[in-house]
Design a protein with these regions (language model features):
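Ubiquitin-like/PB1-type beta-grasp interaction modules and other compact soluble beta-rich domains
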Residues: 1-64
Length: 65
């Protein structure tokens, strides 16, 4: 399926947000995800399905000072 992630079209095989985070090689504890303009709590990622054309914004948290 094709998703729009941070403004770019990407083909993915993930069926849920959790699977997408894993497929993209991200650490779940360091990202926040907005799906179709709604922030999805991390505990809902495993049961949040993805559909062709969904728009996601993924924000990475970086530590430092």
């Amino acid at each position: 399926m094709e998703l729009i992630i941070n403004g770019e079209k990407r083909a993915v095989t993930a069926a849920t947000l959790s699977q997408l985070v894993e497929q993209l090689g991200m650490k779940a504890d360091r990202v926040a995800i907005e799906l179709n303009r709604e922030i999805v709590p991390r505990d809902r990622w495993p049961q949040t399905p993805l559909k062709d054309g969904d728009q996601l914004e993924i924000v990475h948290f970086v530590g430092g000072g």
